[in-house]
């Protein structure tokens, strides 16, 4: 089974890191290679442009693809969106010059809009009943309003810095995007696909969590349990030969700083905090 992964750019390293954390170490995934094996003999990696990945999956060259929702929507491939991988977040926005006088998309009827996403842009304006001339460009979209190529643009933004640097302001949000795990509909229910999806989900579920272990006198257990903000009831185990129990619990990382003094005050000792690599419910 092949997984298509971005071959370069801002999505490349996070995608490889996710594979690594999920237990699918990529063997010799150098920049110039098109294919690479993983430690699982049934899973290999195909490196491709992020924009091409939806087509590779739709054509059966890969069973799974890691790419942005914006790329899949632009490709019109109708893949199965299995999982939001929670990185590469961005927005596709309609923007125009700050002094251009465009305050609503309806004002662009009969105007010109430049974009690297012509299909998404066309659908967006069709839903609004607006008919601008859409010009496809392959880069430097934000410059087009300043050289009289377009009245507005539809482009990707993460922080808005590039738009502000080019004296552009957001008129409307077209699409909110992030990197997803997509599947060919023909194999979406395959057991191996489910195994990979579960592995990825376990990594995401572990993010922001910490595993707490502590020793607690039996007569302090109720007081300690009252201070535990964990995902569920803690695991409590007897410690041989002592009037003490070992308490294990998963908590949100942001709660650790506040909860440790409360646990100590309630009677817990030998508190150990560790990271969690993967969490499978």
Swiss-Prot record:
Disulfide bonds: none annotated. InterPro entries: ATP-PRT_HisG_long, ATP_PRibTrfase_cat, ATP_PRibTrfase_CS, ATP_PRibTrfase_HisG, HisG_C, N-reg_PII-like_a/b, N-reg_PII/ATP_PRibTrfase_C. The keyword Lipid metabolism does not apply. Its cofactor is Mg(2+). Its main location: cytoplasm. Feedback inhibited by histidine. Its EC number is 2.4.2.17. Keywords: Amino-acid biosynthesis, ATP-binding, Cytoplasm, Glycosyltransferase, Histidine biosynthesis, Magnesium, Metal-binding, Nucleotide-binding, Transferase. One of its GO terms (molecular function) is magnesium ion binding. One of its GO terms (biological process) is L-histidine biosynthetic process. It catalyses: 1-(5-phospho-beta-D-ribosyl)-ATP + diphosphate = 5-phospho-alpha-D-ribose 1-diphosphate + ATP. It is an enzyme of class 2 (transferase). It is found in: Cytoplasm. Gene3D superfamilies: 3.30.70.120, Periplasmic binding protein-like II. It holds the Pfam family HisG. Pathway: Amino-acid biosynthesis; L-histidine biosynthesis; L-histidine from 5-phospho-alpha-D-ribose 1-diphosphate: step 1/9. GO terms for cellular component: cytoplasm. Transmembrane segments: none annotated. It comes from the Archaea. NCBIfam families: hisG, HisG_C-term. Catalyzes the condensation of ATP and 5-phosphoribose 1-diphosphate to form N'-(5'-phosphoribosyl)-ATP (PR-ATP). Has a crucial role in the pathway because the rate of histidine biosynthesis seems to be controlled primarily by regulation of HisG enzymatic activity. Belongs to the ATP phosphoribosyltransferase family. Long subfamily. This is ATP phosphoribosyltransferase. It comes from Natronomonas pharaonis (strain ATCC 35678 / DSM 2160 / CIP 103997 / JCM 8858 / NBRC 14720 / NCIMB 2260 / Gabara). The lineage of its organism: Archaea, Methanobacteriati, Methanobacteriota, Stenosarchaea group, Halobacteria. The gene is hisG.
